[in-house]
């Protein structure tokens, strides 16, 4: 009995109308798989949060990165941000760096498309092609970043500038490509494909956010980037972003960054061959006049795409002045203290900060079940039309019931005989090639269960050819030229289930071998660049499809407000020699904009990249400790807390640390003033906080003094008073009442922690310093007290008091710049 074709067509596309997202179990599985290869690093995993401009080097003196604050003019950042915001779109291509979820990311400029299903390689990105008229808006920011790069690392800049093909430069700079990220917390990765002999540059173009520091994972260093900040760095070191610091669930935030780099594959022989092919083709096209008339081949060096070697850094709070540009006046003196503090067996840190730099048995870290997902801001979204299909259990189970509709006996009554014949032939050809490859795999390993999909194989080409026919089958079933998103979803999942079942039933492959996930990935490839296989089709089919494509495009144009979709279709098949057609001259004088070279000279004038000079003079450090309000002996913390607090799981967790119990059983630290101590050429002096001396020291350390001053205005005034006693910088040592993982915690756990933490740390301060009611502050509260420039925050690892050290310049920012400039002039 013949099936009713109308009912069949209706039933084929009658899929569940529930939101097309994955189940929680599927999301969790995807997340776990992603973080195996690309883990997230939270703030707790680092030692230093670096806030100011500085030059960061590894243990052998090689530059990791140079960061410059507010180095971009406002107009340049604003112009680029306005254009590039739309370049960051949901993409599954970088989902492994976002816990298995598609982040907001995109590329602009030129790209090689090596390993991509896009056939036409080494050319403009679709974004630049589609926004060619507006593209010059990025030229100022690209010019400024390039000049900053040239001033900071001239040898690297020159190597990159000499290697990059002129055809793919962005506005004459050594950058070929931009990567734009929006609200994207990246997991640990290196930038594979960047030019080995150069550096990459990153700029924050826009945003309102806290946290999301650029973390150099192997060094424990976080660099806080805010709008208009620029960093030149070795992108072959593993790097990531720390958590966003949200005060409450649903807090609004935004962050737009741009990475500037040279994609090394654009200078390889295959790319030059593509450039030359396009150039020769353009000579026969009288309708198009190229901007560039020859291809100059350049030496590209060797890019091995391996992570840079890691030479660890010995860190202490005194490492910060060795790095910060605004503290270079005291860098050599700080180096003396740093070396003495990090020497084997040194107890200098305990003398200055009240505890060692690292404690192995401090307050325990949280379990993953207490934390929000690192990509938790990525709310579930419908799949993109450029994707494959939803893999939810409901969608899959429905598709299993409907896969029969792609059998020939059903299609016979629903589509043309010609299209059915094409379907049968393409399907048979693909299954034949899959069978051959599977037989070869079994010959090598009879126990094999998984099918290895080779992207460059004949089987892969046959799959895309089958997809082209399948797309026409879908349109034939619908009886229209354009499918709705939900119709595409329904068809492609049914298509994948049908093919997976065919592999199992006809080729006797294990069900897991040709999995739905594997087919979904390849369908995403097809929907992004399936036109690459058009050239392999028979001439009569090419003609029929071209006519059909023309009708579809015409229908799209009539129904859309802009030509963006037409542009995209044109980009996929664009084979012209259109390099540098987007370029133009920027008249900086007419706009009254500062020239990039002059601007770079100004913003980099305090940059120090050479070796630090040594000093033999005596370095004097003043350590200020709280006055002993009273002598407290044998304090039992449990007697000091209400029963409800003392019995809470949070209190028990904090009290579980052996280091905490050592603090509780130790003698009070400030019962008497210690004598001055000399370590080499480092002299350490001590004073109570109420009787500051009048002498000037190289460095002043305030050891838990502010916890004795509850009034914020008075505490800020005290910092200013102490800063006046040092010629180098000030170290503010205080308890951070928020735990190091605070912004990664679930909000219910945060609330439980907030209830007990102040009382817990007050107990420790009573024992350590005799402070009856310590004023313990959050990181934000502490930093708001600083009246000058806070250069960095150093975190004593495993500290039972959760101690942090803020490194503070004694001078306001304008005085810092003048002092640094004077030092550079003398140098």
From Swiss-Prot:
Its EC number is 1.14.11.6. The DNA-binding JBP1 domain (DB-JBP1) is necessary and sufficient for binding to J-DNA. This is Thymine dioxygenase JBP1. Binds 1 Fe(2+) ion per subunit. Residues 392-561 are annotated as: DNA-binding JBP1 domain. It catalyses: thymine + 2-oxoglutarate + O2 = 5-hydroxymethyluracil + succinate + CO2. Monomer. Binds to DNA as a monomer. Residues 62-264 are annotated as: Thymine dioxygenase.
């Amino acid at each position: 009995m013949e099936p009713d074709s109308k009912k069949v067509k209706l039933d084929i596309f009658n899929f569940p109308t529930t939101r097309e997202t994955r189940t929680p179990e599927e999301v969790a599985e995807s997340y776990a798989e992603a973080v195996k290869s690309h883990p997230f690093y939270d703030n707790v995993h680092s030692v230093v949060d670096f806030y100011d401009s500085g030059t960061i080097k590894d243990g052998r003196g090689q530059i990791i990165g140079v960061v410059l604050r507010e180095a971009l003019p406002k107009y340049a950042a604003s112009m680029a941000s306005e254009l590039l915001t739309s370049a960051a779109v949901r993409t599954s291509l970088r989902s492994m760096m976002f816990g298995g979820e598609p982040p907001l990311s995109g590329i602009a400029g030129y790209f090689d498309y090596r390993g991509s299903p896009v056939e036409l390689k080494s050319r403009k990105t679709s974004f630049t092609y589609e926004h060619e008229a507006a593209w010059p808006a990025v030229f100022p920011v690209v010019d400024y970043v390039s000049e900053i790069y040239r001033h900071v690392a001239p040898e690297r800049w020159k190597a990159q500038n000499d290697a990059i093909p002129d055809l793919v430069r962005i506005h004459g700079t050594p950058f070929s490509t931009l990567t734009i990220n929006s609200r994207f917390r990246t997991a640990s990765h290196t930038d594979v494909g960047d030019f080995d002999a150069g550096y990459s540059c990153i700029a924050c173009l826009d945003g309102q956010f806290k946290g999301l520091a650029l973390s150099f994972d192997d060094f424990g260093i976080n660099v806080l980037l805010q709008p208009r900040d620029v960093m030149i760095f070795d992108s072959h070191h593993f790097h990531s972003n720390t958590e966003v610091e949200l005060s409450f669930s649903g807090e609004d935030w935004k962050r737009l960054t741009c990475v500037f780099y040279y994609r090394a594959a654009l200078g390889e022989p295959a790319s030059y061959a593509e450039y030359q092919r396009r150039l020769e083709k353009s000579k026969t096209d009288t309708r198009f006049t190229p901007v560039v008339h020859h291809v100059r081949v350049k030496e590209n060096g060797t890019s091995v795409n391996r992570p840079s070697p890691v030479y660890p850094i010995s860190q202490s709070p005194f490492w910060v002045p060795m790095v910060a540009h605004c503290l270079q006046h005291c860098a050599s003196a700080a180096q003396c203290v740093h070396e003495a503090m990090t020497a084997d067996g040194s107890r200098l840190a305990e003398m200055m900060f009240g505890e060692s730099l690292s404690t192995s048995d401090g307050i325990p870290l949280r379990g993953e079940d207490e934390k929000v997902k690192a990509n938790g801001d990525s709310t579930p979204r419908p799949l993109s039309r450029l994707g494959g299909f939803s893999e939810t259990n409901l969608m899959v189970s429905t598709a299993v019931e409907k896969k029969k509709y792609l059998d020939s006996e059903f299609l016979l009554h629903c589509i043309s005989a010609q299209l059915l014949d094409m379907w049968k032939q393409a399907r048979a050809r693909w299954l034949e090639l899959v069978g051959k490859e599977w037989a070869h795999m079994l010959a090598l390993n009879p126990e094999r269960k998984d099918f290895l999909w080779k992207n460059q194989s004949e089987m892969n080409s046959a799959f895309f050819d089958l997809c082209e026919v399948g797309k026409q089958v879908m349109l034939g079933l619908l009886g229209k030229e354009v499918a709705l998103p939900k119709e595409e979803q329904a068809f492609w999942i049914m298509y994948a289930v049908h093919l997976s079942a065919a592999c199992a039933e006809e080729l006797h492959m294990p069900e897991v071998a040709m999995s739905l996930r594997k087919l979904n990935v390849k369908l995403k490839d097809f929907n992004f660049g399936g036109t690459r296989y058009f050239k392999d089709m028979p001439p009569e089919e090419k003609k029929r499809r071209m006519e059909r494509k023309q009708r579809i495009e015409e229908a799209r144009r009539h129904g859309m407000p802009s030509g963006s979709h037409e542009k995209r279709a044109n980009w996929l098949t664009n084979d012209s020699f259109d390099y540098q057609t987007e370029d133009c001259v920027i008249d900086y004088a007419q706009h009254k904009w500062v020239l990039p070279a002059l601007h770079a000279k100004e913003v980099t004038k305090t940059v120090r990249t050479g070796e630090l000079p040594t000093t033999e003079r005596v370095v004097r450090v003043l350590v200020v400790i709280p006055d002993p309000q009273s002598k407290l002996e044998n304090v039992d913390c449990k007697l000091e807390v209400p029963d409800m607090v003392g019995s809470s799981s949070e209190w028990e967790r904090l009290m579980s640390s052996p280091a905490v119990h050592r603090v509780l059983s130790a003698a009070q630290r400030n019962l008497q003033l210690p004598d001055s101590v000399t370590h080499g050429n480092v002299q350490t002096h001590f004073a109570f906080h109420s009787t500051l001396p009048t002498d000037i020291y190289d460095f002043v350390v305030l050891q838990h003094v502010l916890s004795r001053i509850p009034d914020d205005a008075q505490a800020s005034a005290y910092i200013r008073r102490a800063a006046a006693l040092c010629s180098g910088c000030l170290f503010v040592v205080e308890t951070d009442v928020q735990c190091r993982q605070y912004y990664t915690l679930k909000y219910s756990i945060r609330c439980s922690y907030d209830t007990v933490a102040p009382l817990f740390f007050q107990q420790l301060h009573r024992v350590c310093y005799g402070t009856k009611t310590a004023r313990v502050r959050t990181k934000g509260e502490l930093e708001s007290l600083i009246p000058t420039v806070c250069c960095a925050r150093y975190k004593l690892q495993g500290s039972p008091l959760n101690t942090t050290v803020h490194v503070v310049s004694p001078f306001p920012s304008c005085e810092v710049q003048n002092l640094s400039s004077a030092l550079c002039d003398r140098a």
